[in-house]
Regions:
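Binding/recognition "hotspot" determinant
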Residues: 1-59
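Alpha-helical transmembrane segments and their helix-start/interface "positive-inside/aromatic belt" motifs
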Residues: 1-10, 81-101, 204-215, 270
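Alpha-helical membrane-interface segments at transmembrane helix boundaries
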Residues: 45-53, 85-89, 93, 142-145, ...
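Loop-to-transmembrane-helix entry motif
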Residues: 48-55, 91, 95, 172, ...
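Hydrophobic alpha-helical transmembrane segments
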Residues: 54-66, 158, 162-163, 181
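Hydrophobic transmembrane alpha-helix segments characteristic of membrane transport
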Residues: 59-95, 187-201
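Non-cytosolic segments of integral membrane proteins
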Residues: 95-187, 221, 225-278
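Alpha-helical transmembrane segments
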Residues: 192-209, 273-277
């Protein structure tokens, strides 16, 4: 229900949009790919992964032959038992990776999700702290006359626009993590087949590093949300209530947007942060 003041209602609408996106992120980050959007997308991804296994098996032979040709200088070296055994073990392990790749990847994601759950439980948060307009700020805005309220319209419009844009950027980044998970899972048999040959194994290593980074992005996102929740629990204070109303509101909106920018920046760079911290670049 509106307050009857357009400026207050505009700010509250923007903050409700922000709080709604935070709640959505909190739910998404604890959701597994199998349950995302009812699991329909996951069923399609599983089917694609199964279809690409045939391609993976064909590439197994190709990468295996390429590896033997590049690592063996002559036909005589291929007859060495230790070399033949090493190549055989590599081929068997690569075949197992292609065959059981889905199970391995879902297992890795569950490990990352358990880390996310541990972070949430350790923080003591069950939900994100809502950001609300302080009562004293609402009182200052309500006491402003019509002429003096004109600058406030511009300030609140600009601030609300920033909050809406930041909300959309933040939620799109979290959604993109799911799409990266789906793309990596669907195409997994192809890069995993590269482990059959030693020269091509770098492709598989790079793929596993990228997948690990995608899974661990959730930890960075949760940590960023926990830190922001601490900021939101103590909203920006009104330093000097003798200033003009437009200046007070501008200072409040500016500090609020800065805190939001910190959260959005951390979420947006979660992939880069985890790669730098874990050496997965």
């Amino acid at each position: 229900m509106g307050s009857g003041n357009w400026i207050i209602d505009n700010l509250n609408s923007a903050l409700e949009m922000w709080n709604g996106r935070l709640e959505e992120i909190w739910q998404l980050i604890t959701t597994s790919p199998e349950n995302f959007k009812g699991g329909g997308i996951w069923n399609v991804i599983v089917g694609i992964n199964g279809g690409l296994k045939a391609v993976g098996y064909a590439l197994l032979v190709l990468f295996f032959v390429m590896g033997i040709v590049k690592t063996c200088g002559s036909f005589a070296e291929m007859k060495k038992p230790e070399l033949a055994f090493k190549c055989f073990i590599r081929f068997v392990l690569a075949q197992a990776a292609v065959t059981w790749g889905m199970e391995l990847m879902t297992g890795a994601f569950r490990v990352a999700q358990s880390m996310v759950t541990t972070i949430i439980d350790s923080s003591g948060l069950t939900a994100m702290s809502a950001t609300a307009l302080p009562d004293e700020m609402a009182s200052i805005i309500e006491d402003v006359g019509f002429i003096d309220s004109i600058p406030l319209w511009a300030v609140t419009l600009l601030g609300s626009l920033f909050i809406w844009v930041l909300s959309l950027v933040m939620i799109l980044t979290v959604y993109s993590r799911f799409f990266k998970l789906y793309i990596a899972t669907a195409s997994a048999p192809v890069p995993l087949a590269s482990f059959a040959g030693q020269p091509s194994s770098s492709i598989g290593v790079a793929f596993l590093k990228s997948y690990a980074a995608i899974c661990l992005e959730g930890c960075v996102i949760v940590l960023a949300c926990v830190i922001f929740s601490a900021f939101a629990s103590s909203p920006p204070a009104i330093a000097d209530d003798t200033l003009a109303a437009a200046t007070i509101v501008w200072n409040y909106v500016g500090e609020l947007i800065f805190n939001m920018l910190v959260l959005v920046g951390a979420i947006k760079m979660s992939d880069r942060i985890i790669r730098e911290l874990m050496g997965l670049g």
